[in-house]
């Protein structure tokens, strides 16, 4: 069983994750000619890679900085305060993690740039902001920035919330008893202990932003991030350029995850920074903290919620409302051809495409999740019981944060005609791609349940009473972690159902629903895209409700 599990892990997860790097080395002559020494354009492709990477880094760093400003106060509120609606607020924070990004990207686009969104509600004749609006200084398109903030915000909030909940409140209470304001207590006591959580959340959010593809394809306009560039170059058969860019992103993901593993292992330890403010500056800071604690408490608590509502809730409500407005005809021209029903059941027959795409998405999600479960369950026990388990767990973090377009290209090169030549683009290659990132999702969910219960103690008791190792696992261990298994199944299914970037590269003619949304937007079938986005968001809400019910048990 051990060897079979390790072989499956290597073949289905490890090899596809890192094959792209080996492909670059094996095909270095092609990469060198296409990227650095092209006989026609010289090193123009290398310049494009640098330009795209620089833009992606600016975008990701800007989004993470914004997330930290508003995410830290919200994480503190969720971790330390009790109030009505707390569970609902946590669900809203979690929603972007399970929402198909292409549908969410389209909802955001409609909300801010068209008269069907906020602009129409305010009585404007156009959208609230033009699509080409750019944020000064960082020079990043506003729409892309909003989408990346919404999709990375949960990584900051949820990671830091968990870290704060694990910190004992004794020192905070002592600080408050001695007369320190809440902000001073946070700065001197809680912040040093929570810095590893802030650091790990920031790295995960940065990596998520760097690899985001589905929503960015919808709102990017003429801008191009690293993930979008890989999709575009693959479609143009510039495999050497795309693989070189993808390998750079894989290496970046690996470099980012190593410090996270180090600091996440510092349980209960503060990250000490050898820096002290001058006394005069410190007095000024404390005066500001006293004023803010008295006057700005409500602003501090409610501003992050406003950000969450504007970036997550409002786009969902707008796209739902748009389906109603456009149901039978275009509300502004009165033309039936501009209605949802006509585009779904008329000559374009998008309903038939949606039905086929739904069937494909469900098959891919179910099969990939089932295979992932078969690998992940025994792999979880190996991680907990073997010395090399910590290495496996660290490696499993890479597929979670690697840009999905890089992952899709790696799988295409590994199993396709440029590699083993076993599978061509289509549903089975999509399934193999989804297995790579589904296994870590399931493993992390089961590990959370395993580490939260005394599985080993109960299993040892069963072995003492005469049970075999297999019977002990079947009758004792698995029932104890069944909640984690079920949660992992749902999260994996939801992730697979909404994945866009990698799917675009490997799907061939077997289109999934998220990819269909992108195709609809590119074809200007906006009412059909309204309906399909609403359909995807509704599915994610149902899955989130199921997760909430299962985790409460």
Predicted regions and their residues:
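Short glycine/proline-centered loop/turn elements that form peptide/ligand docking sites
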Residues: 167-171, 271-275, 454-458
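The alpha-helix within a helix-turn-helix
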Residues: 175, 462
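Membrane-interfacial, low-structure loops and terminal tails that flank and connect transmembrane helices
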Residues: 271-297
């Amino acid at each position: 069983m051990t060897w079979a599990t390790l072989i499956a892990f290597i073949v289905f997860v490890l090899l596809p994750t890192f094959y792209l790097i080996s492909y670059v080395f094996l095909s270095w002559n092609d990469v060198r000619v296409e990227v650095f020494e092209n006989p026609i354009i010289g090193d123009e492709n290398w310049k494009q890679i640098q330009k795209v990477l620089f833009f992606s880094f600016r975008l990701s760093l800007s989004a993470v900085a914004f997330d930290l400003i508003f995410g830290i106060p919200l994480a503190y509120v969720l971790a330390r305060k009790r109030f009505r609606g707390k569970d609902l607020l946590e669900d809203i924070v979690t929603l972007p993690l399970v929402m198909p990004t292409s549908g969410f990207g389209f909802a955001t686009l409609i909300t801010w740039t068209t008269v069907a969104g906020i602009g129409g509600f305010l009585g404007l004749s156009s959208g609230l902001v033009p699509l080409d609006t750019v944020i000064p200084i960082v020079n990043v398109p506003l729409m892309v920035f909003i989408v990346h903030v919404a999709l990375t915000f949960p990584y900051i909030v949820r990671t830091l919330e968990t870290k704060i909940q694990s910190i004992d409140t004794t020192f905070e209470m002592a600080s408050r008893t001695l007369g320190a304001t809440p902000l001073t207590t946070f700065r001197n006591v809680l912040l040093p202990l929570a810095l590893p959580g802030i650091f790990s959340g920031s790295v995960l959010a940065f990596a998520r932003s760097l690899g985001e593809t589905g929503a960015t394809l919808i709102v990017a306009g003429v801008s191009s991030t690293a993930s979008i560039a890989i999709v575009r170059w693959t479609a143009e058969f510039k495999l050497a350029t795309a693989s070189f860019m993808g390998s750079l992103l894989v290496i970046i993901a690996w470099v980012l995850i190593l410090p996270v593993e180090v600091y996440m292992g510092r349980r209960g330890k503060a990250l000490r920074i050898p820096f002290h403010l001058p006394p005069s500056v410190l007095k000024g800071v404390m005066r500001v903290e006293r004023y803010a604690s008295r006057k700005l408490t409500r602003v501090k608590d409610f501003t992050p919620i406003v950000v969450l509502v504007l970036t997550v809730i409002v786009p969902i409500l707008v796209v739902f409302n748009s389906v109603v407005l456009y149901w039978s005809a275009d509300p502004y021209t009165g033309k039936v051809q501009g209605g949802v029903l006509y585009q779904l059941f008329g000559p374009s027959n998008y309903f038939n495409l949606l039905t086929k795409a739904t069937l494909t998405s469900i098959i891919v999600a179910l099969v990939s999740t089932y295979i992932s479960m078969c690998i992940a369950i025994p792999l979880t026990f190996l991680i907990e019981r073997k010395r090399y388990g910590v290495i496996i767990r660290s490696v499993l973090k890479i597929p979670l944060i690697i840009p999905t377009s890089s992952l899709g290209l790696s799988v295409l090169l590994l199993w396709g005609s440029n590699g083993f030549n076993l599978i061509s683009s289509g549903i089975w290659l999509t399934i193999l791609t989804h297995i790579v990132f589904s296994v870590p999702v399931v493993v992390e969910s089961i590990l959370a349940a395993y580490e939260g219960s005394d599985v080993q103690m109960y299993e040892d008791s069963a072995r003492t009473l005469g049970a075999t190792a297999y019977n002990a696992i079947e009758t004792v261990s698995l029932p104890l972690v069944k909640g984690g298994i079920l949660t992992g199944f749902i999260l994996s299914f939801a992730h697979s159902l909404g994945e866009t970037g990698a799917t675009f590269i490997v799907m061939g003619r077997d289109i999934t629903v998220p990819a269909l949304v992108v195709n609809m937007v590119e074809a200007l079938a906006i009412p059909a895209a309204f309906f399909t986005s609403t359909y995807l968001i509704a599915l994610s809400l149902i899955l989130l409700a199921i997760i909430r019910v299962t985790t409460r048990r």
